[in-house]
């Protein structure tokens, strides 16, 4: 498929493409157990829903939904299985890269995606994430950084910004911790 065939033909088609639900997202979410089966459970202002839509749109555009396995560790990331219509494995806190590595090595045709928040990736799972990157494992890691532990009430995370106030850091964060700088020695293809 070339770029021209993907481009909307007119403004009306473009507006429809923006509102269209990706096929890689379930049309309703009965697993979450609430009355309204078509809305997500994420907090107002949270970026998870937007990130889900972007990932699902890419899965659709690339035609890889049937090959995808989403790794969902503890934290708000664990709820990805409510929304993504693809394989999903829920893992213990910080262990997503290890599970993703195992699946990727066992199922060569699988497209393995680890969807991790800052509590999981930047805290308890930092070592596993860096080691998987250093080994060059065939996994995609989506790091959702909202600078706090959102699921448990907004406590300070390793990614909390200098001066940012949280429930557990009411005068503002002190020293800076940059995961980008920590990751640089791994010589990854892309760090942003």
Where does each model-flagged region fall?
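Glycine/charged-rich beta-loop-alpha catalytic/anionic-binding loops adjacent to active sites
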Residues: 30-40, 78-89, 110-113, 161-167
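Conserved active-site and cofactor/substrate-binding residues in soluble primary-metabolism enzymes
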Residues: 49-54, 65, 94-98, 107, ...
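Phosphate/pyrophosphate-binding betaalpha-module
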Residues: 128, 134-179, 183
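Iron-sulfur (Fe-S) cluster-binding modules
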Residues: 1-42, 48-68
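Thiamine diphosphate
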Residues: 74-150
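Conserved beta-ketoacyl condensing-enzyme motif
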Residues: 62-80
């Amino acid at each position: 498929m070339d770029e021209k065939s993907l481009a909307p033909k007119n403004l009306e088609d473009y507006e429809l493409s923006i509102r269209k639900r990706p096929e890689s997202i379930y049309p309703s979410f009965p697993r979450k157990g609430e009355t309204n089966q078509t809305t997500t459970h994420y907090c107002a202002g949270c970026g998870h829903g937007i990130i889900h839509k972007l990932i699902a749109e890419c899965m659709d555009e690339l035609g890889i939904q049937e090959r995808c396995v989403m790794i969902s560790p503890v934290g708000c990331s664990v709820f990805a299985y409510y929304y993504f219509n693809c394989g999903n494995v829920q893992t213990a806190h910080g262990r997503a890269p290890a599970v993703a590595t195992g699946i990727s090595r066992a199922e060569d045709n699988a497209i393995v995606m680890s969807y991790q928040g800052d509590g999981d990736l930047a805290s308890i799972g930092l070592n596993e994430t860096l080691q998987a990157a250093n080994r060059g494992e065939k996994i995609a890691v989506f790091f959702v950084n909202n600078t706090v532990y959102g699921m448990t009430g907004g406590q300070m995370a390793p990614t909390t910004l200098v001066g940012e106030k949280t429930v557990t850091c009411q005068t503002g964060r002190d020293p800076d911790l940059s995961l980008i700088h920590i990751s640089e020695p791994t010589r990854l293809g892309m760090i942003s």
